[in-house]
């Protein structure tokens, strides 16, 4: 059922995977990603924990209406959040690739 090495080998692999996941989560938390809107007129930088680190607004937008600026900031934040999610998925995809898991076994992520 568990292939060569039995349950002990599976437990060892699970521990190794847990260690890799811990390191990967620390790496992801330190990442910074910038989202943009309005063709780069508004930029929002967030970290892997989705905390906003920086907001950059092109000076030309200060003359426009408040609602448009608010929409651009929200769109830039959403773009940054989408980018960090994609980066997290890419980094986590390789964690379980070396494990010999039973057929049909699904990881919790």
Curated annotation (Swiss-Prot):
Compartments where found: Cytoplasm, Nucleoid
Keywords linked to the UniProt accession: Cytoplasm, DNA-binding
Pfam families in the cross-refs: YbaB_DNA_bd
One annotated GO molecular function: DNA binding
Segments for region (Disordered): 1-23, 89-109
Entry's Gene Ontology cellular component terms: bacterial nucleoid; cytosol
Family assignment from sequence similarity: Belongs to the YbaB/EbfC family.
Oligomeric form and interacting partners: Homodimer.
PANTHER family xrefs: NUCLEOID-ASSOCIATED PROTEIN YBAB (PTHR33449:SF1)
Function noted in UniProt: Binds to DNA and alters its conformation. May be involved in regulation of gene expression, nucleoid organization and DNA protection.
NCBIfam families with a match to the protein in the record: DNA_YbaB_EbfC
Name the record gives this protein: Nucleoid-associated protein plu3840
């Amino acid at each position: 059922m568990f292939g060569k090495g039995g349950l002990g080998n599976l437990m060892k692999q699970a521990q190794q995977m847990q260690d890799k996941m811990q390191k990967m989560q620390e790496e992801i938390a330190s990442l910074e990603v910038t989202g943009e809107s309005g063709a780069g007129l508004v930029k929002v930088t967030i970290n892997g924990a989705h905390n906003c680190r920086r907001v950059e607004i092109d000076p030309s937008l200060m003359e426009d209406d408040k609602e448009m600026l608010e929409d651009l900031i929200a769109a830039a934040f959403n773009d940054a959040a989408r980018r960090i999610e994609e980066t997290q998925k890419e980094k986590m995809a390789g964690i379980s690739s070396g494990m010999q898991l039973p057929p049909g076994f699904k990881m919790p992520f």
